Amino acid sequence: LVKHIKSLSDENFNTDDYTCFLGRGAYDHYIPSAIDQLILRQEFYTSYTPYQPEISQGTLQAIFEYQTMISELTGLPVANASMYDGASALAEAAVMSCEATRRNEILIANSVHPESRQVLNTYAKFRNIIVKEIQYNNGQTDLDDLNAKINDNTAAVMVQSPNYFGIIEDVEAISEIVHKNK
């Protein structure tokens, strides 16, 4: 029975034999073997966020050491490693872009994960930031729509690659459009 089921399953394409671009966050992930040992350290068994400093000293120490190392590697005076996840990091980057450029419009590809776009809209709602979505064509960011929407008030153009549909975006073409319209 096991051999029969295995022979049936072998008729399917699988991610062991083919490159996977399923999208929606379903990708092959490489996890270095050192991680298995590091997660066993006691300081990582504390809470997810260091809101209770008295029981999160290990997490705070690890964040401090990481930030210090990144600062030394990059030569920058400061580094920050306290973003929750990709969606909040995207939203924080949008806010920083608006503050740095003194512009208040963000263009985000409609092919970015919907939950990330929702988080961005939540951040933007009370900050006078206008979020406009760039449509997609055949699963990729529509470059004509980007060209039509980018303007002097655009603080940032945000894309995800591979995108929500698992398609690699033409980041080089997007970058050319953005730099042409600085």
PLM regions and their residue ranges:
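Structural signal for hydrophobic packing residues in well-ordered secondary-structure cores
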Residues: 5-16, 39, 67, 71-78, ...
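Noncatalytic linker/hinge segments flanking ATPase motor cores
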Residues: 59-63, 70, 176
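Gly/Ser/Thr-rich helix-start
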Residues: 24, 76, 167
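Conserved PLP-enzyme active-site core in the AAT-like
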Residues: 88-182
